[in-house]
Amino acid sequence: MKYLPFLLFLLLNAGTATAQNNLVINGIPWFDDKGNIVNAHGACIVEENGRYYLFGEWKSDKSNAFPGFSCYSSDDLVNWKFENIVLKVQPDGILGPNRVGERVKVMKCPKTGEYIMLMHADDMGYKDPYIGLATCKTIAGDYQLQGPLLYKGQPVKRWDMGTFQDADGKGYLLIHHGPVYRLSDDYRSIEAEVAHIKGMGESPAMFKKNGVYFMLTSNLTSWEKNDNFYFTAPQIEGPWTKQGLFCPEGKLTYNSQTTFVFPLKCGNDTIPMFMGDRWSYPHQASAATYVWMPLQVEGTKISIPEYWQAWDINELKPVNPLSGSLQIEKKQIYADSCWHITKDKMESDAK
């Protein structure tokens, strides 16, 4: 690990000249309103009343043990305000000391108005997995852990997971290697297994576009990146068809792993925004970063044909992050990679 001086651009300094800051800049640390690194991995986004809420894993550089789930908010998906550690380490149980908490996902239940949080809980050896359930009356408040999510009265003992909320208000739990479960009307338990997608991997993420359901997933390479792939279906129940990669082969999903697909409003349309993690185990708090980019959709085909180091979230086009930027004082951060300028482009050797 290197301790590097990192020259921050004003574009990255949340809370400073925010009116000029509409760029998503991939693969480098983001900073919140307090000047701290945005620490929200394996994340999801919930939009409410014109504001976006980012939930993720509050990582540590010292241990993979669960330190809590974080929440940030923003009105533009670029400048983030720290809200709360919305679920803290529990005194005991599935998210007690020396346990793992990952893949946090939050949905608002349309029937009850309650915020439902699901997550993967485990022991440090990943041999005691559970899908956990927590609830809260307010979106960024203190969530209460209710225990394992139950299906037919039994805990769901699986690990990598995601969620999907359909336009009809039904909620779904997505599980590694293929199971898709429909949640009960109050989202507090599982009602039925509605599909099993053969050939799936880990980190499932689902979205719907033009009547087609898409399921993104990664291969199994632990913390290492790989070429993620996807499936499609005319309905959640299937039949599901494997379509292949959505990034160029060998690009390793631009050194990231799928975590979520957010429906980004663009005029009268909605653009699916890929959200991926660049893991940097064991230095996840200081060196792990994010890759967010719009997915191109044509029928049953999706793609991210090229990597955008930075892009304008309003115009959905790539931008040179050095163009017109103003440099500010240096800050010290931990990093496992170096940044350099080549032919007026900012590039990283991040793994």
Predicted segments — roles?
Residues M1-N21:
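Bacterial Sec-dependent N-terminal signal peptides
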Residues A19-K345:
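Carbohydrate-active catalytic/glycan-binding domains of CAZyme proteins
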Residues E347-K351:
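Short beta-strands within extracellular/lumenal beta-sheet-rich domains
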